[in-house]
C-alpha cells in the first residue's frame, strides 16, 4: 500500500497543507489539500475520496478539485462519508450558494460528483482497498478509517479526542502496519483541546495506552503556531515508534 502525505497540519500557512492522505494515487482520505498538492494531471487520477467530517480543514479543496477537472473527459468523483457528513456537504458546501451543486452538473443523469452515504463500520471496496469508517470523538460527527489491502492494514483516526471503539477495532486488525492519529495542541491548551475534541501530547500518551499492538504511530494535525511546543512535548514522552507525518513524503506499508 502506498500512502502519500498531501497535507498533515491543522491549519494553513505556506508550506503547511491541511489534512489529506493519498492512497495508491487514486483514493484520498480527507481533502484538506488535494488540489493544493497535486498537479492537474494527478488530480484527474483521484476518483474516490473518504471524508471523515465536515470541518473545512478536511474538505476545503473539494470544490476546487472538481472545478479544476470538470471538463476533463470522463472525470467523475465519488465522495464517501457517514450520513451526517454527506448532509453537511449537501446543505453547506455544494448548496448552490457556497459552491455549485455538482451532484446535478452537467446534468442529473451524469453528474461529475456522487455523494455516497456509508454507515459506521460498513466496508467499501475501491481500487483494491477495503475502507471502513469508525466513529471517533470529535466536536461534530466524525469517523476515522481502517484501510486494508491483501497484505496489510493501516488505521487513521482523523480528528479526535479520547475515544474507545477505534482502538478496539485497531487492536483486532490482522497485518496492522501503522496507526495515524492526531495531536493538535500543546499541553498548556488542554482545556481547549477538551472542548474542541482534540488531543494534546499528554492526552495522546493516555490514548496510546489503549493500543496493544507494537506498530509505528504517525502524528498529524498540529496547529502551525504550536508545532514547536507540540514536538518538544511529544519527544518528552520517549515513546519508541512515535513520529510525525512529513508533508510530501511517500510511505509504503
Language-model segments: which ranges?
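Conserved beta-strand hairpin/beta-sheet module of binuclear metal-dependent hydrolase folds
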Residues: 1-42, 143-159
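Active-site neighborhood of phospho(di)ester-bond hydrolases with catalytic His/Asp-centered motifs
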Residues: 29-32, 47-57, 80-82, 155-160, ...
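Active-site metal-binding motif and surrounding structural segment of the metallo-beta-lactamase
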Residues: 35-81, 176-177
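Active-site catalytic pocket residues across diverse enzymes, especially alpha/beta-hydrolases
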Residues: 66-69, 93, 170, 234
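Metallo-beta-lactamase
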Residues: 85-142, 239-252
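Catalytic core of the metallo-beta-lactamase
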Residues: 116-174
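Cap/insert and terminal regions of metallo-dependent hydrolase folds
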Residues: 163-252
